[in-house]
UniProtKB/Swiss-Prot annotation:
Changing C81R: Cells grow as well as wild-type, loss of methyltransferase activity, DNA affinity is about 10-fold lower than wild-type. This is Type II methyltransferase M.HhaI. Monomer. Its EC number is 2.1.1.37. It comes from the Bacteria. The lineage of its organism: Bacteria, Pseudomonadati, Pseudomonadota, Gammaproteobacteria, Pasteurellales. It catalyses: a 2'-deoxycytidine in DNA + S-adenosyl-L-methionine = a 5-methyl-2'-deoxycytidine in DNA + S-adenosyl-L-homocysteine + H(+). The active site is at C81. The gene is hhaIM. NCBIfam families: dcm (TIGR00675). Belongs to the class I-like SAM-binding methyltransferase superfamily. C5-methyltransferase family. GO terms for biological process: DNA restriction-modification system; methylation. The keyword DNA-binding applies. Gene3D superfamilies: DNA Methylase, subunit A, domain 2, Vaccinia Virus protein VP39.
Length: 327
């Protein structure tokens, strides 16, 4: 994550729904806002959230009475992506998870925050021929909010990972916010090699397989792309080896193969997957962030997480708009 000196959200309160690891919380707190409520149903995510923020999020959002939620200025929600992910079953609103958006809507209707800040998978934009996004947009408009949506890629905002997500920003209409802009992309100058742990800490991750085939030479220059160098086995999604002079593949909560969830990388002549701490760095989490002690849970959690830096840039621009200062 980046250091933000100009705290655009100072004095504002927010709630953290579908909180996961607390990525939204890190981003908004870095801009000066205060978290007054968190909600997350997964017990392992609750554990790591409490380890880092000293509070256990409330559980099942469908059972929460919206009237009991504290007043707030910004509602944050990276609502579940499994229902909309290309690697999932693509049911969306027909799946019970899909209807969790309506729990967001009923809280918005009751509490009327100034801003609603949502995140979802890229596929959300095209899901069900665009109807899913249309339902969200129409619902927010009915509740008297504007609706801004854009797909942004983490690699355009300082993070060496191809991770495209849709970000949805809604301002309450009576605020008459006309000047909101999504952050402008900039050239990447950090690559996977810059985020690696010392070899001595990751020796247990090294894979030595007889069916390892290197198909390409290591590259000399860094590049804002994934660069495949080789494969093991049949070369399926979790069996590919990449250069650390490029960017990381999209971290995933699911998938199989020897390098499942992170991809394989050629590091100082050896092949391995990423360490959970390296996954944290590739998502913008600071090294002060405590990772779940279960390695399998940690990989899953970062595969499901939000990218801190992208949220920080958006949060800053939200604050700029509320403070009537164009970015």
């Amino acid at each position: 994550m980046i250091e933000i000196k100009d705290k655009q959200l100072t004095g504002l309160r927010f709630i953290d729904l579908f909180a996961g690891l607390g990525g939204f919380r890190l981003a908004l707190e870095s801009c000066g806002a205060e978290c007054v409520y968190s909600n997350e149903w997964d017990k392992y995510a609750q554990e790591v959230y409490e380890m880092n923020f000293g509070e256990k999020p409330e559980g099942d959002i469908t059972q929460v009475n919206e009237k009991t939620i504290p007043d707030h200025d910004i509602l944050c929600a990276g609502f579940p992506c499994q229902a909309f992910s290309i690697s999932g079953k693509q049911k969306g609103f027909e799946d019970s998870r899909g209807t969790l958006f309506f729990d967001i809507a009923r809280i918005v209707r009751e509490k009327k925050p100034k801003v609603v800040f949502m995140e979802n998978v890229k596929n959300f934009a095209s899901h069900d021929n665009g109807n899913t996004l249309e339902v969200v947009k129409n619902t927010m408009n009915e509740l008297d909010y504007s609706f801004h949506a854009k797909v942004l890629n983490a690699l355009d905002y300082g993070i060496p990972q191809k991770r495209e997500r849709i970000y949805m920003i809604c301002f309450r209409n009576d605020l008459n916010i006309q000047n909101f802009q999504f952050p402008k992309p900039f050239e990447l100058n950090t690559f996977v090699k810059d985020l690696l742990l010392p070899d001595s800490e990751v020796e247990h991750l090294v894979i030595d397989r007889k069916d390892l085939v290197m198909t390409n030479q290591e590259i000399e220059q860094t590049t804002p792309k994934t660069v495949r160098l080789g494969i093991v086995g049949k070369g399926g999604q979790g069996e590919r080896i990449y250069s650390t002079r490029g960017i990381a593949i999209t971290l995933s909560a699911y998938g199989g193969g020897i390098f499942a969830k992170t991809g394989g990388y050629l590091v100082n002549g050896k092949t391995r997957k990423l360490h959970p701490r390296e996954c944290a760095r590739v998502m913008g989490y600071p090294d002060s962030y405590k990772v779940h002690p279960s390695t399998s849970q940690a990989y899953k959690q970062f595969g499901n997480s939000v990218v801190i830096n992208v949220l920080q840039y958006i949060a800053y621009n939200i604050g700029s708009s509320l403070n009537f200062k164009p970015y």
